């Protein structure tokens, strides 16, 4: 077996990457806590609300320490916002919109969490420990499109490759700086030798000519690509600096992209076959511990711990335990009938959640690869669709599913308020401006608005400094024997790493507290 075929057959598993030294183990993430059993030898009971990643991780780690855990999950699946949509997936949104996914076998999109940063070591630790194979997620592609809808001048209503945009703006910026240096306006700060070194850097950074002018180079691509014989290739002409300044292309949506975000620096990863491979791996470790279709109705403190009332087979059922770890999103928690402290209830009421939505579009052929040479990555626009994501799996296949929009805030709210057919229509009409192939190749769609997904009602917690100072501390301390977990109790909101690290924090705190009991 060749090295290439081995990678393809394993999906570039974590073990493979580690064996070749491309990824290193993270021993700091090993969780080694001392056992703190009861003096009577019985396991301490813990009820965990929610089978998202925070709840699953809590049950998994406490289970290893000998606790008797029960996880109550309102849905028939685990994962929470780690949700892979594939053929047969069904969802009824708040408001009654129902849909069933019609994707062909092997096609999917991740409706929630969709990428793993290389620097989220705890997430990678659990993928390693649970045996979840990973592959590359291509989040940055210079061949993807930018499209400026509206504006003025030569670039109004025009799409361009990201590489053209980056090359032109780096070139013109470097040209302006090089000219300023040549005018000796910085002599007081820099020596002559310093100026020469900086100009050399700018000439390389902006790919300037000998006259320190930017005229466009092969960095931005070709009109006609190079070929054999007497075919050197024809360079594409750059757009003018004034064209950029007069257009809408100077908006943050175009230049403030993931390339500048710490968590989105390459390399990014994804589980082979869908992000739900992670919660499914936890499920295998927690066999018999998760009760599905069990929405929680009440949470009460008792003299000896907690009492939880939940629905099972249409009937109210009661469960008591020594401790409760509540891993419900705050929009769900605030509707729960409970005797949580006023501070916790106030935090749940006032900490906002992101409105966000996605749509998966299945096409007959992968025209973005065949026609546009786009293999993974993200196109961006100032329209309501905001982003188009291209799949990093199934390359060179026949059919494909791309994410036709991924939007936030008021745009996500407006699009989410549309009927399902209206969301699809908007995605196709606006996406057509980047990909004219849409009408001919489209087959079906599946959309979701997280603010309308039952048992979530939002994408992730959104903090500003004031909200963080005023409400966040109440989420971090136990309320009697009730602990809170979830990305909303971390500074890693919106990431799976937030769920993981919150669970670890709660397990440590609860276990240390039990240790104090044991000593008495």
Locate each region found by the language model:
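N-terminal secretory signal peptides and thylakoid transit peptides that target proteins
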Residues: 1-14
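N-terminal glycine-rich phosphate/pyrophosphate-binding loop and immediately adjacent elements
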Residues: 34-176
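Conserved flavin/dinucleotide-binding core of flavoenzymes
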Residues: 9, 18, 22, 29-33, ...
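Short glycine/proline-rich turn/loop motifs
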Residues: 37-40, 101-108, 253-267, 284, ...
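Active-site rim elements
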Residues: 106-117, 264-272, 344-352, 410-421, ...
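Active-site/ligand-binding neighborhood in enzyme catalytic cores
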Residues: 143, 150, 174-295, 303-305, ...
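Mid-domain catalytic core of redox enzymes
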Residues: 292-403
